[in-house]
């Protein structure tokens, strides 16, 4: 009788199991997918079937066994694999009852061969497992083959189950308190140190010895801090007490060996306990002077600092001085104002100039021409040359007019008329060529004098930069005649010119 009762405790009652298996599945357990011909197929997922089997039979009330797996076909086409597998699985209960069935799994167009085998075999075993569990009753999926039941279960409404955070399996549930206390000695030295500190912080009252003749002290409960009870160990001989202290100290040093530990290995609780220990030490003396209340810290710009400090009560040590200049910075003028640099400062820096205009003339404004930097001596020399050459300009202008008229008369084969007859005599025909060459030389000389005057005035133009070919890195002439050959890809352009006369018939 005792053995039968133990069996009933270990295994579920057969009547309860049969009652659960006779019930049909609710809509929460049924899933649907699209089958062949756009028809919807009802099925139960593999993980739901395993959960139902654990709830009905118990976690140790049933077992599975894969009898055989057969690869039906393996095709490879264009680097993709298609596999079909057949699996035979047996599900056995604790009393020896079992169900055995077949399952099939197929994978198509899988690029990786191992992944194709994995998916095909797993799907075959899962299919066989669900078919085996279906043989035990409606609650494990047999009701899904009843079409009348499926037509009615679609009309049943249900609310999805809420997510329960309290029903989660956490790491704290993994080990019991008893087993955790037994394995604490095998932890790292930081845990040992924490355990030792907790033991030292609690006064040991087991070693207290009272005199038998004296009455036992009455136990009182109050909120006052407890004082350590004086034991008779302090009245022990000095020799024995010193030996015990040395032995305890050596044991503590073995446990608190910090030779192989770093600051990162210390736990947060341990650091807090060490800080509390240091603060509670009566031998340490700290300065308990009240700290100055500096108030809230506010970030403002340098311009707004002066106005902010005038309205708010800012301590003197925290005020911002906008006129503060570090000793490492050497300034020539005051930075608070905008003014010209004194000439005395420029002379100290080695700049020799009589006026600021002479200095600023070297730096032209945007969009203007930059004149040549010319000294004062050259300016005076150019001024004298301009005065001396004023008369020359008038003479050269008059002579150039006469020379141009003479050139035109020579080219046309006529004499000079008008006012030029009084100043220029008629030139014989055989000396016309020499006369023209002399006139052209004078004109070139006049043009060169004009260009020299323009250059002396300091006008500077940027020279023409030669164009460099990107492939040959050679300069391309600026005035290069374009070839008449048409480039590839461009339309043909006819040259503008006189049309050829059409041939007459």
UniProtKB/Swiss-Prot annotation:
Positions with biased composition (Polar residues): 406-439, 448-457, 470-482
Annotated region described as Disordered, given as residue ranges: 178-251, 368-505
Biased composition (Basic and acidic residues): 229-251, 378-404
Keyword DNA-binding: yes
Domain of life, per lineage: Eukaryota
Keyword terms, alphabetized: DNA damage, DNA recombination, DNA repair, DNA-binding, Nucleus
DNA-binding region of this protein: 130-134
GO biological process terms, semicolon-separated: DNA amplification; DNA recombinase assembly; double-strand break repair via break-induced replication; double-strand break repair via single-strand annealing; meiotic joint molecule formation; mitochondrial DNA repair; postreplication repair; telomere maintenance via recombination
Keyword Nucleus: yes
Localization of this protein: Nucleus
Recorded GO CC terms: mitochondrion; nuclear chromosome
Transmembrane segments: none
InterPro entries: DNA_recomb/repair_Rad52 (IPR004585), Rad52_fam (IPR041247), Rad52_Rad59_Rad22 (IPR007232), Rad52_Rad59_Rad22_sf (IPR042525)
Short name of one Pfam family: Rad52_Rad22
GO molecular function: DNA strand exchange activity; DNA/DNA annealing activity
Function (record text): Involved in DNA double-strand break (DSB) repair and recombination. Promotes the annealing of complementary single-stranded DNA and by stimulation of the RAD51 recombinase.
Assembly behavior: Part of a complex that includes RAD51, RAD52 and RAD59.
Family: Belongs to the RAD52 family.
Protein name: DNA repair and recombination protein RAD52
The species this protein was found in: Candida glabrata (strain ATCC 2001 / BCRC 20586 / JCM 3761 / NBRC 0622 / NRRL Y-65 / CBS 138)
GN (gene name): RAD52
């Amino acid at each position: 009788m005792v053995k039968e009762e133990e069996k009933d405790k270990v295994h579920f009652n057969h009547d309860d199991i049969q009652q659960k298996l006779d019930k049909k599945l609710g809509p929460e357990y049924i899933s649907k997918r699209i089958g062949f011909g756009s028809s919807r197929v009802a099925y139960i997922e593999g993980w739901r079937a395993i959960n139902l089997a654990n709830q009905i039979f118990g976690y140790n009330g049933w077992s599975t066994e894969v009898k055989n797996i057969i690869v039906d076909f393996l095709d490879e086409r264009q680097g993709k694999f298609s596999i079909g597998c057949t699996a035979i699985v047996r599900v056995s209960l604790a009393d020896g009852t079992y169900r055995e069935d077949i399952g099939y799994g197929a994978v198509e167009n899988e690029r990786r061969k191992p992944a194709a085998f994995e998916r095909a075999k797993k799907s075959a075993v899962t299919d066989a497992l669900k078919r085996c569990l279906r043989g035990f009753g409606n609650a494990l999926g047999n009701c899904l083959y009843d079409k009348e039941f499926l037509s009615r279960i679609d009309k049943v409404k249900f609310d999805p189950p809420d997510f329960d955070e309290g029903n989660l399996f956490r790491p704290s549930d993994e080990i019991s308190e008893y087993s955790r206390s037994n394995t604490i000695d095998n932890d790292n030295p930081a845990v040992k140190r924490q355990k030792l500190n907790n033991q030292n912080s609690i006064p040991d009252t087991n070693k207290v010895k009272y005199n038998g003749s004296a009455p036992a002290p009455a136990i009182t409960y109050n909120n006052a801090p407890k004082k350590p009870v004086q034991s008779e160990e302090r009245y022990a001989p000095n020799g024995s007490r010193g030996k015990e202290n040395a032995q305890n100290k050596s044991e503590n040093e073995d446990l608190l060996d910090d030779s192989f530990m770093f600051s990162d290995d210390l736990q947060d609780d341990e650091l807090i306990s060490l800080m509390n220990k240091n603060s509670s030490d009566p031998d340490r003396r700290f300065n308990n002077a009240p700290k100055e209340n500096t108030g809230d810290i506010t970030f403002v710009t340098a311009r707004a600092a002066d106005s902010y400090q005038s309205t708010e009560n800012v301590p003197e040590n925290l005020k911002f001085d906008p006129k503060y200049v570090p000793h490492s910075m050497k300034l020539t003028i005051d930075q608070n104002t905008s003014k010209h640099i004194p000439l005395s400062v420029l002379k100290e820096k080695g700049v020799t100039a009589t006026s600021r205009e002479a200095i600023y003339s070297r730096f032209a404004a945007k969009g203007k021409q930059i004149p040549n930097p010319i000294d004062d001596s050259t300016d005076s020399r150019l001024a004298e040359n301009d005065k001396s050459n004023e008369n020359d300009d008038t003479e050269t202008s008059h002579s150039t007019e006469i020379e141009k008229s003479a050139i035109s008369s020579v080219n046309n084969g006529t004499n000079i008329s008008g006012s030029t007859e009084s100043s220029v005599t008629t030139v014989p025909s055989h000396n016309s060529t020499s006369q023209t060459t002399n006139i052209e030389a004078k004109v070139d000389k006049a043009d060169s004098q004009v260009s020299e005057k323009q250059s002396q005035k300091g006008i500077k133009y940027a020279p023409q930069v030669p164009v460099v070919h990107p492939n040959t890195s050679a300069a391309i002439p600026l005035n290069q005649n374009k070839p008449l050959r048409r480039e590839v890809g461009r339309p043909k352009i006819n040259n503008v010119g006189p049309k050829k006369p059409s041939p007459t018939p």
